[in-house]
């Protein structure tokens, strides 16, 4: 692969959620080149079986490696919870997930911890296990929020119906007296305004995106892979409709990106490097 320092970091999610990780990377590692992939054709991930998720991530990692990435960040809690260990055993490229950094961030803030996440992430028990491993004295309550991702992807963040759904999902956690709330899905940061309007002021929100980017920086330093030069423009690719993703991403990026469509089913035959797009 040549000089690893100048190779891009790969980020992937099922959709818009990973943009929260992308923006954290822009802030903390502005010199790094990035490839962002959204598996929008198979969104949402939260109701997929473990077998399906592992296969999806295999396909994405195969494509990412063909693009020459030096590292991959799973900007998706569901795939981090279900597929991370399997994928790490199958691919040479270093892969970072959200669960462990997010759990460590949570226990640094409080002891009565609520986790909002997809059904698959909740079912996996990954956050609860990681939080209790980091602090056995912590108390953890999890709440699946299956409605959140479709509402965010449909750009219904400011819809009164959305606030009612968020209130319904948060209420059981508030009744437990949580002092910390973990965004256990990268999409949920997009609802932070709604969520924080409902939470008492003393409840601290933890965004694992910030912590996984810090872990990414530490890994790059350890490997000697930090990019000493200016970054290339961010490259965006999706498995679904490029125009739809570009329009939806515009509000979060501040500009409308150029987006390439990738057919993951044919990726082994056609995994040629992406042309650089504006970002």
Swiss-Prot record:
The family database entries (Pfam families) matched by this protein are listed as: Asp_Glu_race
Binding site residues for substrate: 13-14, 45-46, 77-78, 186-187
Might you name a Gene Ontology BP term for this protein? regulation of cell shape
SUPFAM superfamilies in UniProt: Aspartate/glutamate racemase (SSF53681)
Mind listing the GO molecular function terms for this protein?
Answer: glutamate racemase activity
**Pathways involved:** Cell wall biogenesis; peptidoglycan biosynthesis
Q: Which Gene3D superfamilies match?
A: 3.40.50.1860
Lipid biosynthesis found in the keyword field:
no
**Keywords (A to Z) from UniProt:** Cell shape, Cell wall biogenesis/degradation, Isomerase, Peptidoglycan synthesis
> Could you confirm whether the keyword Isomerase appears in this record?
yes
Q: Under which EC number(s) is this enzyme classified? A: 5.1.1.3
Question: Which transformation does this protein catalyse, written as a reaction?
Answer: L-glutamate = D-glutamate
Catalytic residues as annotated in Swiss-Prot or TrEMBL? 76, 185
Family statement drawn from the similarity comment of this UniProt entry:
Belongs to the aspartate/glutamate racemases family.
The cross-references to HAMAP family, in alphabetical order and at most eight, read: Glu_racemase (MF_00258)
State the function annotated in the UniProt record.
Answer: Provides the (R)-glutamate required for cell wall biosynthesis.
Return the protein name: Glutamate racemase
Source organism per entry reads: Picosynechococcus sp. (strain ATCC 27264 / PCC 7002 / PR-6) (Agmenellum quadruplicatum)
């Amino acid at each position: 692969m040549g000089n690893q320092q100048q190779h891009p970091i790969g980020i992937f999610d099922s959709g818009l959620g990973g943009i929260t990780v992308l923006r954290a990377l822009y802030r903390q590692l502005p010199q790094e080149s990035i490839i962002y992939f959204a598996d929008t054709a198979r969104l949402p991930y939260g109701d997929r079986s473990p077998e399906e998720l592992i296969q999806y991530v295999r396909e994405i990692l195969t494509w990412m490696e063909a693009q020459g990435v030096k590292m991959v960040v799973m900007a998706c809690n569901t795939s981090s919870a279900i597929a991370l260990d399997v994928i790490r055993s199958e691919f040479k490229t270093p892969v970072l997930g959200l669960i462990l950094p997010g759990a460590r961030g949570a226990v640094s803030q409080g002891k009565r911890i609520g986790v909002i996440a997809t059904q698959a992430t909740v079912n996996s028990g990954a956050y609860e296990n990681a939080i209790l491993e980091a602090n056995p004295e912590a108390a953890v309550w999890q709440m699946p929020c299956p409605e959140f991702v479709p509402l965010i992807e449909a750009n219904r963040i400011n819809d009164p119906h959305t606030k009612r759904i968020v209130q319904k999902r948060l209420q059981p956690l508030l009744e437990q007296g949580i002092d910390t709330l973990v965004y256990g899905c990268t999409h949920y940061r997009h609802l932070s305004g709604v969520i924080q309007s409902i939470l008492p002021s003393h409840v601290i929100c933890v965004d694992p995106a910030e912590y996984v980017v810090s872990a990414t920086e530490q890994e790059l330093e350890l490997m000697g892979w930090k990019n000493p030069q200016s970054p290339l423009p961010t490259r965006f690719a999706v498995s679904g409709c490029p125009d739809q993703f570009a329009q939806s991403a515009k509000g979060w990026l501040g500009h409308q990106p150029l987006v390439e469509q990738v057919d993951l089913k044919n990726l082994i035959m056609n995994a040629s490097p992406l042309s650089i797009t504006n970002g």
